[in-house]
Amino acid sequence: MDQLKRSLLEAPIIEKNGYHYFVHPISDGVPKLDPGLLREIVIRIIRKAKLEDVDRIVTPAAMGIHISTAVSLMTDIPLTVIRKREYGLDDEVAISQQTGYSENEMYINDVREGEKVLVLDDVLSTGGTLAAVLDALDEIGAEVIDTVAVIKKVGGENKAADAGHDVKTLINVDVVDGEVVIVDEDGDS
């Protein structure tokens, strides 16, 4: 059994405002992130994502950063982090992020019209974060070459899909009776 699948099956489940989610090193930073798990994920992303002609990797803070940094190191593709803090730079674009359990403002800086980007994130659950990011990149005029989320939690709405965005995933899971259930161990192509 691969490390990603095993780690998800062992993940504790918590409830926050009626929303059940798993606590996992990739999505939450706890428990500790084993380097072998991160390596496995990075290799799978590199194999699954379209990387040809990508100018930059774009990821939302915070839990996409470690994944995207590792992919950047392996591919030599520069990385831009979408921050939760406003800097007031000339090219800054504000976006509203709505997830199953929170609502925040995020800010994209240093992404230009015509740039070809790979969007990476840790989890696709409601699709709120990725839908907002992908819509903002479209408004900027960046060309999204590919979008990959490590884990997809199925069973609810998917704002990214509803907005016409295709997102590849490495593994798809659901939470049933307080446990993670693997729905598709290969994710979405």
From Swiss-Prot:
Q: Which GO molecular function annotations are given, in alphabetical order?
A: transferase activity
Q: Example GO biological process term?
A: purine ribonucleoside salvage
Which top-level group of life is the source organism from? Archaea
* Alphabetical list of InterPro entries matching this protein: HGPRTase-like, PRibTrfase_dom, PRTase-like, Pur/Pyrimidine_PRTase
SUPFAM superfamilies linked: PRTase-like
Task: Give the EC number(s) listed in the UniProt record.
Answer: 2.4.2.-
Q: Keywords, A to Z?
A: Purine salvage, Transferase
- Function field: May catalyze a purine salvage reaction, the substrate is unknown.
Family classification? Belongs to the purine/pyrimidine phosphoribosyltransferase family. Archaeal HPRT subfamily.
Which protein, by its recorded name, is this? HGPRTase-like protein 1
